[in-house]
Amino acid sequence: MTLKKVDANPSTLESSLQELKSDETSRSKINFILFLADNDPTTGQSWCPDCVRAEPVIYKTLEEFPEEVKLIRAYAGDRPTWRTPAHPWRVDSRFKLTGVPTLVRWDGDSVKGRLEDHQAHLPHLILPLLAPST
């Protein structure tokens, strides 16, 4: 049906999450956060090969879902920024990221499902995240 994408970074993710929480229409939608590596300015592609592989699969799977899906694309930064052990999303108890891409189903204020970097490119694993949450 419809995939609505919103971009965020470490300094804007909280405001994007607050918008989701306060938006009455978003509460009834399926919401995801896709944590990604930034694009390399010299190539125009992500510096992360797993992100390059997973992004089109994730977008296609979510776009084909019959209900509206909202996706926050959360860009973690360039390679040195992401590799920092103190990266905000590595130490945030809600996310505890260890790799990118990471796809999470976000309901309310918490993660209701996730696919790590080695799983995020597999449609048969993405589809269960679209199931109604309980």
From Swiss-Prot:
Record's GO cellular component terms: cytosol; plastid
Lineage top rank: taxon: Eukaryota
GO molecular function: protein-disulfide reductase [NAD(P)H] activity
Keyword hit for Electron transport: yes
InterPro entries named in the record: Thioredoxin-like_sf, TXNDC17-like, TXNDC17_dom
CDD domains in UniProt: TRP14_like
SUPFAM superfamilies: Thioredoxin-like
Every Thioredoxin domain range: 1-134
Annotated function: Probable thiol-disulfide oxidoreductase that may participate in various redox reactions.
Protein's name according to its UniProt entry: Thioredoxin-like protein Clot
Organism of origin: Arabidopsis thaliana
